[in-house]
Amino acid sequence: RQRTRPFDFQRKIHNMSHPDIPGFIERIRAVTEEYDAIFTVAEVGGDDAEAEMKAFTQGDNRLNSAYGFNFLYADRLTPSLVCAALAEWPDEEGLGWPSWAFENHDAPRAVSRWCAPKDRDLFARMKMLLLASLRGNIILYQGEELGLTQVDIPFEQLQDPEAIANWPQTLGRDG
């Protein structure tokens, strides 16, 4: 993935992969335990995302779930991609619980990335069935359930501050 946003150039020494994060997560969990029906989830990226997702979710005193970027920036949906992602989360007691996302505000819509235009309607349905069949929770990006494709929005219509500041290098969050 091409580095174009200011975030991509930051040294993330205090907000990613920091040794104090698991302890901080335990403090968050302690607060959430005071309320009913709370679900906590982490978005985890970086060089050691798999280990960190497990560390952030293992046991009963950390987050309920985590998701990474296995699918978000993949150019193609392949059986090996799905198998590799599932292999990271074997069904083992105390290991943690995954969540899965194929799309979000920082990645192009999966239907546009993974499928030719002529097959998008059927592919969007298949993609939702696949997402629902993965062991874990589903995280849907607004419009994903409808099979929405990535939209090019003219600069004049942009609302997203990051897209405006980095035009035309970055994908806007408006579409």
Map each language-model feature to its residues.
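Active-site and adjacent substrate-binding regions of carbohydrate-active enzymes
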Residues: R1-G175
